[in-house]
Swiss-Prot record:
This protein binds specifically to 23S rRNA; its binding is stimulated by other ribosomal proteins, e.g. L4, L17, and L20. It is important during the early stages of 50S assembly. It makes multiple contacts with different domains of the 23S rRNA in the assembled 50S subunit and ribosome. Keywords: Ribonucleoprotein, Ribosomal protein, RNA-binding, rRNA-binding. It comes from the Bacteria. It comes from Rhodospirillum centenum (strain ATCC 51521 / SW). GO terms for cellular component: cytosolic large ribosomal subunit. This is Large ribosomal subunit protein uL22. GO terms for biological process: translation.
Amino acid sequence: MGKPAAERRLSENEAQAFARLIRSSPRKLNLVAQLIRGKAAGEALALLTFSKRRVAGEVKKVLQSAIANAENNHQLDVDRLYVSHATVGRALVMKRFHARARGRGARVEKWFSNLTVVVRERADEPVQEAAE
């Protein structure tokens, strides 16, 4: 548990953004993160905009922040960005008590999650000329 032994270093064509303590379970948040993994940044934003899941708004904010970091801090071309990593991790769990019948009680767990989004600039693909 805890942090990995070696932190992941970003290359020159990458930018990232974090969100800590998102009020959603990691399992539900990962469903939305799977939607955007490997997609172009514009396409991922469109998917999140029209997603019916409540947590999609939080993921969209983090993705927009990663895109802004790429543009302003790393001078990357926004049109060539894609989501290379979207990582979901467990954060704290709040324990609550729910009163039940006959003097009993039930434990309610309110899960929190962390989200990391890394965007990468696509490399220039060599243009192949048609052989005549």
